[in-house]
Each structure stands twice: as C-alpha cells, then as structure tokens.
Amino acid sequence: MIQPQTYLNVADNSGARKLMCIRILGASNRKYGNIGDIIIAVTKEAVPNMPLKKSEVVRAVIVRTCKEVRRDNGMTIRFDDNVAATTNQEGNPKGTRVFGPVARESRGYNFTKIIPLAPEVL
C-alpha cells in the first residue's frame, strides 16, 4: 500500500534512486496504491549525469510493495521494499533495464513493456 509521502526505491536505470509519491492516479480521492498502479512522484535522490535529476516530477508504476497481495489461487506474495519503475506520459519505461523481480500483477494493467526488461517475474 503506497500513499502520498511514501518513499520508494527505483527499479530501473533512469537515473533516479529514490522517489516520493505525491499522488495516486485513478479516482479523485484515492488514498492507496498497489502493484500496477500509476503514481506521480518527485525524485528525492538521483545519480549524477543521468537523465532524471533531483526534484523532478515523474510518473511511475508500482512494481513491488511490502504489503502482501492476494492472488486468485489463494497465494499471497510480498516483497522486502516498495519499488517503482519510472515511465513517460504514454506508459513506456524511461529506463532500459529493470533491477530485481517484478510482480505478475503488473501484466494485467497493460504495462507489458516493463515485464520483458525484468530479470524475474514472480
């Protein structure tokens, strides 16, 4: 569960290291975001000489959360950290690589371009 003011790590090589969620897109009063949701975030920590700079506002897709997600077959899955992958306005990833596993739930939300970049899909 991601809410505004939540800090997230970045799963791609776009140049950002940490993001802070400022809005969950969807309904006008949406309070929480889960895997596969789009958020608007601000870059809090960045790598020097990379495309994304500190204090830049970006869109991102949540790919891992600490809060467990229940699947249709009864299995629950959770991760050790909250992680997002940065995207552009059309939903295409800004980075060329994704680090760490990505939850299978993000496939159902039409983010099929992030799935092939990931080394593992859980």
Curated annotation (Swiss-Prot):
GO terms for molecular function: large ribosomal subunit rRNA binding; structural constituent of ribosome. One of its GO terms (cellular component) is cytosolic large ribosomal subunit. InterPro entries: Ribosomal_uL14, Ribosomal_uL14_bac-type, Ribosomal_uL14_sf. GO terms for biological process: translation. It comes from the Eukaryota. Keywords: Chloroplast, Plastid, Ribonucleoprotein, Ribosomal protein, RNA-binding, rRNA-binding. Its main location: plastid. Pfam families: Ribosomal_L14. It is found in: Plastid, Chloroplast. Binds to 23S rRNA. Belongs to the universal ribosomal protein uL14 family. NCBIfam families: rplN_bact (TIGR01067). HAMAP family: Ribosomal_uL14 (MF_01367). Part of the 50S ribosomal subunit. This is Large ribosomal subunit protein uL14c. It comes from Anthoceros angustus. The gene is rpl14.
